[in-house]
Amino acid sequence: MIIMGIDPGFAITGYGVVKYEGNKFSVLDYNAITTVASMKFSDRLLVLYNELEKLINKFRPDAISIEELFFNKNIKTALTVGHGRGVAVLAAAKSGIDIFEYTPLQVKQSVVGYGRAEKAQVQQMVKAILNLPAIPKPDDVADALAVAICHGNSHRMGALLGNDRF
């Protein structure tokens, strides 16, 4: 199973593509899609959409997992991230590939085993699970890989419980 994880954002959207076979993960690709602050708002969203569409077409994942937004105290930041998230969900939905959404708590629980884990703990586990030489940077990329791992683990649990939705 090929899983694309997306950590949505406006300035930076992290993505990670992993292959999950049996109970082992291997990384196929990971990076960040960035937009330039001087660009028009709509053009930045278009860049994000076009880049995600290219990646989806290149890897043809079996599932796309996206991190849900958590409440942000800065309402303007939350709104701009929300726009980026909407574009990511649209690109995924347009592809016809199943979309799975996970909260940060679910991702931490799945990757680290503790829902209140610190970001550094999640990053270390991503590095270890995927046998990477270093923690992926920026943080958004490690987060995207973590949400992909979360879906792989959820898929395995769903299969064990006889739930074919995953």
Curated annotation (Swiss-Prot):
- List, separated by semicolons, the cofactors it needs: Mg(2+)
Q: Which UniProt keywords apply?
A: Cytoplasm, DNA damage, DNA recombination, DNA repair, DNA-binding, Endonuclease, Hydrolase, Magnesium, Metal-binding, Nuclease
Single GO biological process annotation from the record? DNA recombination
- Gene Ontology MF, one: DNA binding
What reaction(s) does this enzyme catalyze? Endonucleolytic cleavage at a junction such as a reciprocal single-stranded crossover between two homologous DNA duplexes (Holliday junction)
- Cellular localisation: Cytoplasm
Return the cofactor note field. Binds 2 Mg(2+) ion per subunit.
What SUPFAM superfamilies does its record include? Ribonuclease H-like
Q: Which residues participate directly in catalysis?
A: D7, E67, D140
Task: Give binding positions for Mg(2+) 1.
Answer: D7, D140
Q: What is its EC number?
A: 3.1.21.10
Binding of Mg(2+) 2, residues: E67
Which residues, by range, are in coiled-coil regions? none
Q: What class of enzyme is it?
A: hydrolase
Gene Ontology cellular component terms for the protein in this record: cytoplasm; Holliday junction resolvase complex
Family stated for the protein in its record: Belongs to the RuvC family.
Q: What is the annotated role of this protein in its UniProt record?
A: The RuvA-RuvB-RuvC complex processes Holliday junction (HJ) DNA during genetic recombination and DNA repair. Endonuclease that resolves HJ intermediates. Cleaves cruciform DNA by making single-stranded nicks across the HJ at symmetrical positions within the homologous arms, yielding a 5'-phosphate and a 3'-hydroxyl group; requires a central core of homology in the junction. The consensus cleavage sequence is 5'-(A/T)TT(C/G)-3'. Cleavage occurs on the 3'-side of the TT dinucleotide at the point of strand exchange.
Quaternary structure, per UniProt, is:
Homodimer which binds Holliday junction (HJ) DNA. The HJ becomes 2-fold symmetrical on binding to RuvC with unstacked arms; it has a different conformation from HJ DNA in complex with RuvA. In the full resolvosome a probable DNA-RuvA(4)-RuvB(12)-RuvC(2) complex forms which resolves the HJ.
Q: What protein name applies here?
A: Crossover junction endodeoxyribonuclease RuvC
Q: Which organism is it from?
A: Ruminiclostridium cellulolyticum (strain ATCC 35319 / DSM 5812 / JCM 6584 / H10)
